[in-house]
Amino acid sequence: MTRNQLHNWLNAGFFGLLLLLIHVQGQDSPEANPIRNTHTGQIQGSLIHVKDTKAGVHTFLGIPFAKPPVGPLRFAPPEAPEPWSGVRDGTAHPAMCLQNLDMLNEAGLPDMKMMLSSFPMSEDCLYLNIYTPAHAHEGSNLPVMVWIHGGALVIGMASMFDGSLLTVNEDLVVVTIQYRLGVLGFFSTGDQHARGNWGYLDQAAALRWVQQNIAHFGGNPDRVTIFGESAGGTSVSSHVVSPMSQGLFHGAIMESGVALLPDLISETSEMVSTTVAKLSGCEAMDSQALVRCLRGKSEAEILAINKVFKMIPAVVDGEFFPRHPKELLASEDFHPVPSIIGVNNDEFGWSIPVVMGSAQMIKGITRENLQAVLKDTAVQMMLPPECSDLLMEEYMGDTEDAQTLQIQFTEMMGDFMFVIPALQVAHFQRSHAPVYFYEFQHPPSYFKDVRPPHVKADHADEIPFVFASFFWGMKLDFTEEEELLSRRMMKYWANFARHGNPNSEGLPYWPVMDHDEQYLQLDIQPAVGRALKAGRLQFWTKTLPQKIQELKASQDKHREL
């Protein structure tokens, strides 16, 4: 697919979706206008007929699960939503949370920005969407899957992900939720005046809402699985370790994101709070005055501050995270739920370097400048610059060829950011509860004219296979083989949501990850693999820390002398 085709296809898909919605909403039958109760009032949804199936889906959009987090509730935990009288309209997508859409332009995705810009944006954004089979009713007790979107905790929205096909194909309830992003979601003063992690508290509030209400929509509150990708996977993993979220769900799926992702968790709020104070003109204040000053800023002023953050970390706040996730994972009283954890085989292949603005730098890597590039990279990884030699030895060896060096660099970054953290979390969890691990390996055919030919399964490539559609429910030109892979992946995910085990008759067997380190290679022909990246894991978790310790010891000795 060329960039031009992608542009035309995005537009056609978007307007096609609108026409479909308008057409179905126009039908005036009781079934076309479903009304359901919630603990705060009644909501009316729509009936959607899913193309190529005889089945219908009831959608309920923009349901509030918390009070608008504005005024005194900015930088405060979410509060229960206000009740309403009459029947609330649940046929329009909610406003997305405040975010910097210019990031998409900078990433060379103006079409995506154009589409997102057609949706309203507001600080009042704590809403969720529900997709449920049209036959479902109270007492249906269907499994529930709650999707948490990714986007580095700074960008994204619930409505980009259409749960209709997953709902229809697997006869379950899909919920997509929103949460505060960027500064509004994760600013912290590091004390009682603004502890932070507001976005995670929003997600927990949405999960509490699901517990209280999902039975009215045909869902089983005792069979809730949370799933998400990238920062959404990090969110899922964070709820698995947080004592505040215990009992709100029964299974977890982490796609290319866990609580140990290096850029999305921080011991201290200092760097973010200092930057925010400086940019907002609220400097030289104690934390109480800083929070008061920031609450007085307009949405436009907050957006301007958000622009400097391409990602933002959650913080060890003493409440949502009583200790660092690594300590929580290792603690005796850790009680995880059964989990699917996985990565793609080219996580840093294309889209992340483009979004982060490092694609040109990678293209310029040669043997001559490699040492300097690795020194800079080591510093960004918070490693001593002296570690650059070890990185070179492990990933590049004596290779002279520039393209090979560039590919090895992206493998190194993918391992550091995604693969190693995912394997570490899987190893912590598997001694307490079942873990099913996967590596997604299929490069989608519809991207072959958009991306460089060496890119394999890039970050987020598995999402359309799980939802059987691209953003906003747009149908993809899957090949027959891809159609089968998508059906299998939906079935694995749904089986797991239903029983805590992805396996069933007719599917290639997916073994639990035990001490034999088995995992599933998710490809056109799925196969069982063993000990994914065991050598790299050894390097990052044993060799490198040992080298850093030796360096520190010799520096300390040198200082004493």
Curated annotation (Swiss-Prot):
The residue numbers the entry assigns to motif Prevents secretion from ER are: 558-561
For this entry, the protein name equals: Acylcarnitine hydrolase
Cysteine pairs forming cystine bridges in this chain are C97-C125, C282-C293
- Active site as annotated: S230, E347, H459
EC numbers? 3.1.1.28, 3.1.1.-
Compartments where located: Microsome; Endoplasmic reticulum
What keywords is this UniProt entry annotated with? Disulfide bond, Endoplasmic reticulum, Hydrolase, Lipid metabolism, Microsome, Serine esterase, Signal
- Native organism is Mus musculus (Mouse)
Asked whether the keyword Amino-acid biosynthesis is assigned, the reply is no
Give an example GO cellular component term for this record. intracellular membrane-bounded organelle
Q: Which reaction does it catalyse?
A: an O-acyl-(R)-carnitine + H2O = (R)-carnitine + a fatty acid + H(+); all-trans-retinyl hexadecanoate + H2O = all-trans-retinol + hexadecanoate + H(+)
Q: Does the keyword Endoplasmic reticulum apply?
A: yes
What PANTHER family does the record point to? CARBOXYLESTERASE (PTHR11559)
Q: What induces it?
A: Up-regulated in liver by di-(2-ethylhexyl)phtalate (DEHP).
Q: What class of enzyme is it?
A: hydrolase
Q: Which residues constitute the signal peptide according to the record? A: 1-26
- Function, please? Hydrolase with high activity towards palmitoylcarnitine. Is also active with p-nitrophenylacetate and alpha-naphthylacetate. May also hydrolyze retinyl esters.
Source species taxonomy: Eukaryota, Metazoa, Chordata, Craniata, Vertebrata
Please state which protein family the record places this protein in.
Answer: Belongs to the type-B carboxylesterase/lipase family.
Any GO MF annotation of the entry: all-trans-retinyl-palmitate hydrolase, all-trans-retinol forming activity
